[in-house]
Structures are given as C-alpha cells and as structure tokens.
Amino acid sequence: MSNNGSSPLVLWYNQLGMNDVDRVGGKNASLGEMITNLSGMGVSVPNGFATTADAFNQFLDQSGVNQRIYALLDETDIDDVSALAKAGAQIRQWIIDTPFQSELENAIRDAYDLLSADDAEASFAVRSSATAEDMPDASFAGQQETFLNVQGFDAVLVAVKHVFASLFNDRAISYRVHQGYDHRGVALSAGVQRMVRSDLASSGVMFSIDTESGFDQVVFITSAWGLGEMVVQGAVNPDEFYVHKPTLAAGRPAIVRRTMGSKKIRMVYAPTQEHGKQVRIEDVPQEQRDIFSLSNEEVQELAKQAVQIEKHYGRPMDIEWAKDGHTGKLFIVQARPETVRSRGQVMERYTLHAQGQIIAEGRAIGHRIGAGPVKVIHDISEMNRIEPGDVLVTDMTDPDWEPIMKKASAIVTNRGGRTCHAAIIARELGIPAVVGCGDATDRIQENQNVTVSCAEGDTGYVYAELLDFSVKSSSVGDMPDLPLKVMMNVGNPDRAFDFACLPNEGVGLARLEFIINRMIGVHPRALLEFDDQEPGLQNEIRELMKGYDSPREFYVGRLTEGIATLGAAFYPKRVIVRLSDFKSNEYANLVGGERYEPEEENPMLGFRGAGRYVSESFRDCFALECEAMKRVRNDMGLTNVEVMVPFVRTVAQAKAVVEELERQGLKRGENGLKIIMMCEIPSNALLAEQFLEYFDGFSIGSNDMTQLALGLDRDSGVVSELFDERNDAVKALLSMAIRAAKKQGKYVGICGQGPSDHEDFAAWLMEEGIDSLSLNPDTVVQTWLGLAELKK
C-alpha cells in the first residue's frame, strides 16, 4: 500500500486526521478524524481508504498530462462559458484516457481486497476530496464527483479515474479562479468507503447551526427516502427538523419544529455496474411521501451525533448522514466546516415595503430580497442567456451552474431543499433563492419583472412585479444599560432564530395567531368534530395533517412546535406567550370555521379573549392550547415560557380564567409558571389592583387601550388620525396600571405598537418606571440606543 517506502499512495481512514488535509483533502481527512476520535462517543462512520495527493500528482507528472492541462488553462478565458466548457471537456478526457501506473493500481487493489474481504458483493461510494476543499473559507459544495453503488475492483478503479478527472469540472475550474486558488496547488484524493444501504431507508444533510440565521442552539436536519444525493443535489424537497441543543442535553424531547417535504423521488441501486449507471431514480410511493422519513427518536439520535461532531471540531459543521435499511443504524458519511456563517455577521435587514401578487413560493434561502427580469433556463446549454441582474428560474440549480449563478439577482427553482448544493452556493454568494416551488418554471414568464423575497420567514415569495424594498445595515456591539428591559414582539416562529440574534432581553409578546393561521389553518372545533365533517372538508383536513396521528394531535402538535420554537430561540430568556386572541370573523376564516362562529357586527368587541376560553362553546378548544403549553413547559422543560391571557373584561372573568387554566393543568406558581394579563381595557387600569390579585403582572396592550379609551375603531380610515397612544387620557390609564403593579411588586411591561412608533412615548414609559418595552424587531436597536442617549 505504499510506494516502495516513499510517500504512501493509499491510506486507511483510521490512519488519518485533520492534520492530513494536504495529503487526502478535507473530506477524507475529516472521515479519518471522526473514525479515530469519535467512534467511542456514539458517532458511526463507515470504514474506507483514500488515495493521496502524492498519488494524484505522480499520476499527472509521470504521464506528462499535467503540462498539457496547465497550458490549456492558462490560455482559456474562464468567464467565457463556451471556452470553459470546451477546455474542461478536453482536460477530463485526457485524464480518463491516461492509464494508472502499476504501483497506484496495485495499492488500490490491496486496499480494496482488505475492505471487501468479509463481503465479496459489497458496494462502495467513491468520492472526491480536494486538498483545498471544505476549508472554512472555501465551500467547494460538491464540485467534484461522487459515484455510488460501485461494486468490484474494476468498477472502483474506473470510478477513481473519473474522480481524478472531476478536479477539472467546469464549475471547479471557475470556482478556483474566482476564489484565488492556483490550479497547480490543488490536488485530488479519492475516498473509497463502504456503502450504507440507505437506498432501502433514508438519508440527508444536517447542520449543527441554523443555516439561515446563524443561530447556534439548534441542529437542523433534512431527510428524504433513498440515497442522499437527491437531497444534496436539490432534486427533492426533503423533510426538515429542528432540534434544540440545551433541551437535548437535558435528556428531554427536543424537536421544536418538523416540516414535511414532498419527497417525490428517490435514488436507489440499479442492477447494472456500467460506469455512471450504478444508481437509478424512481418515484416514491404516495404512502411514503405522506409520512416523515425519520422517527422522532432517530432525529434526536442524529442531533446527538451532530453535537458530538461540532464539539470535537469546535465549530459549526455541515454533515451528511445515512440510515442503513438492513440494520436501522444511523451513519455519518461526511462532515465539513459550515462555511457561510464563519465569515462573520453584519446585521443587515431587508424590508419589503409593498405586497403584490404572489406567483410562486417555496423555501427561503437567506433573508435578502432581489428583483429583476426573469430568465427561464431549461437546460445548461442556455447558460449564456443569463445577464447580470437577471432572476434565474429553473427546475433545479445543479452546481455545474455556479459560473452563472453569481450573475443572478435571485434564483428560483422547482425542486430542492435548504441544504442542497444550490442553496449553499446561493448563501455563499449572498443571493436570495427560493427553492422547491414545484411549478415556478410554468408560472413565471420569460422576461417578466419580478421581486424575490426571502425576508418574510421560512417561506420565500416571488411577486409578479418590481416592489419597493430597502436594506439597513448596522454594526452592533454590547448594548448600553437601561433602567428597563428591551424585549421583542414575535409572532412568526419561522423568524424566531433570526430575531434571537438581535440584541434583546426576551420576548414580551409571542402571538399564537400566526401559528394557528399559517401552521395549522383549521378551526379547532372542526378537528375535534372531524368525523362529523362532510367528506370534502375531511379530505382537505387530511391533506393538511399529514404526518400526525389524529386531528387533535395535529392541532396540539403544531401548536407545541410553534411555541417550542419561540421558547427555544430565546432560551433561557423570558418568553411571554399570549393565548389565542382571534376574533370570531378571524376564526371563521379558518378551514371549517364558518360553521362554528357567530356573525358579529363588531368582532373587535365581541367573542374574544378570556371570555371565549371559559365559555361552554369553546372550553374544549381552549384545552388544546393548554395541552400544547404543558408539553412545552413540562415535557420539554422550556420553563422560560410564560402564559399571557388577553382581553379580560371583568374581575370575575379574571378569576374564572385562572381557575380554568388550573383545571387544564396550568396552575400559577407550579413549576415556576407565571400567568400575565394583557392590560388593554380601561376597566383593567381602573381596577388594576383587583385584577392583579389573580395574575403575576400586566403587559399593556396600548393598541386596544387607545381605541377603547378614545372610542375609536382603529381599522377605520375615517377616524384614524385621532388614534394616538400619547393622548393624555390613554397615558393616565397607563400610569394607573404601572403604579398598581409597582405597588404590589409585580411585573409590568408594554407590548403594544406605541413605543415602537414613538420614541418620545417610549421615553415617557421609561420615566414612569415600566419594567419592559416589547418592541417590533426592526425598531429594537434604534429605540434602545435612543433611550440610552436620553439617559446620559
């Protein structure tokens, strides 16, 4: 296995570590590092061997092909797509036509014989590992080849030759030039690894960090049926899971969010060993598309392995995993540094100032917005049609397209998930991308002007016109001390990890309405009485609740995930979750809701808040919210989550709702539970001391308080100019509430819009002695710094 005592041509993974990157590249060095150091810590990596950089360089040198390669590259204009394609094809053919020296062929044969000794029909993965690949400043993102289900020595030898040639793929040549790498300084190592039979199970990619926000307290896992190449390439829309690291470390259920992907196709073994045809793609049966491709226990097991790998490397990691269909065992097949977040973070906020017609939606990559004319590209041969500033719309953006991706103002694809190669490249280039839209190439027209927004959460939108947007950059260090806490209003769990990276002291208002509306979408009564619904409605609900065991579990489970995401994002800081405050017309708009909601002239003043919770017609629906709260606090241990009750009209209602919460297992003081009341009706301030007997504090809702104090409909344009939280009557009521809470030593904050809109109002509240301001995320830094200036 060595070259007559000189530098080895082949090395086993258990002989390798991260100090061998220059010999076997980042990918193979990392596999060796894990086998050597993490095998005893629950991290399983299939065995294998690697050809060395010396083997590659000797192969090029002794054959003389290297001189032809570098001469051709030196005279080729890399930015000329056609010239690049012609040169790349010529170089790859030269390498494939060049025979291996006998020493290298024999070294590979010896290693292969040992690796396959226990199973003559074993199959192997043959992967590339470039000596500059997977360094923290160079995300080569699959620019070299991988060959799967390679059986027999001759097939392995052919695959190694093609791996060597792949160092000169068009995308790899282009990438090296634009990243400043010298072609002569990069070599290739081929890794030969025993295959995990994930063609019979599932596989995917995971990150030990949230890829979009850089939030480092979660593991993000993607999964689909079959071999992992489909997820990596972006050919399928995979299942997604978020696992909260502190909850996992505490030994509790730690999955805070699950999203089911369509998983329409999978890659499996093919019956032939003809090179390049050892795998095939097939449709996934509908019954498998409609279930998650990993169990909750498997998700948590993978997350534990990710945490161990991250801990060992001391940095966020990008990890490929596979489940063996024969044994059910989970394996790690690759691990590399996560590249994008390591580059440092400038706080950059993109804001869309208008809404337009949505023509496509999918998974948002990044948080930026791009706009421009559309180019619908159906085939790589059309690459030269892309001009700088175009929006690239295609079925899936293979990494071969990297030379043109950097020209685009945005990228939109039919297929792909947030861990595919295209998503990684888009993040690295700082280009917004919306992937997995399904039918974008049909719905978006050539040369149509569109706006692509990734600034609205996990879902990215393509709008049918050029919309106004802005970007605000700021550099934030340590924030100055204030006599109050600056908290945040958050409704969309999709944005929670992003917002948690802003300066904050917790969440003063987490709304359930977004979760119920967008993540569930069905009236709770329609789920509780599912069997009584008409067949058409039942089918609509079944489509929404895929992956959940029952209609009730769908509601409670989705609500639990939404609340847990908010609680985990800001853990261990305080997160005050307001129970649902839909009005009857809003509940009626949910699927199945019209049947159960009254027609009201003014729903704003009707059947809402605490009165709804204790009514006979809604009590068992309210129990579902309480069940979700209990799971988050008691099962998952996210006791930083507190409960807030909205729209409590009378003291008797206050007493009744607290008793109902206790009946549902949410007893004030038990397991540290605090119950806060929204102070948003004049009666709440006028009788503040009586209301506070039943609660642990107030959160002032200045929006409702203003409209009720001044007799305004805040949704009416006719009287909107009179709506002002700074009105003396409103301020008098707020002062009463603040003083009453202070007198009893209880918490008092504000979560209404006022302090976000009016810095002078925020300053007045600070002088009044309020404990916290809960602001819109986009005003947190500005208001915080502004108040600090006033205190000087």
Residue ranges and their predicted role:
Residues G214, V450, D704:
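Small/polar (Gly/Ser/Thr/Ala-rich) solvent-exposed segments
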Residues A138, L148-V150, A159-V160, S202-T211, ...:
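Beta-strand scaffold of nucleotide-dependent catalytic cores
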Residues M34-N37, D210-S213, K407, A423-I431, ...:
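Alpha-helix C-terminal capping segments
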Residues M1-G191, L200, Q286-E297, L302, ...:
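N-terminal beta-alpha lobe that positions the nucleotide/phosphoryl donor
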Residues V218-D318, K323-D324, R363-G370, P388, ...:
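Conserved catalytic alpha/beta cores of large enzymes that bind or transform nucleotide phosphates
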Residues G142, G314-T339:
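Conserved metal-phosphate-binding beta-hairpin within the catalytic cores
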Residues N66, E338-R343, M347, A360-A364, ...:
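Acidic, glycine-rich flexible loop/linker segments
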Residues Y112, D119-A125, A130-F140, Q144-L148, ...:
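Conserved alpha/beta-domain cores
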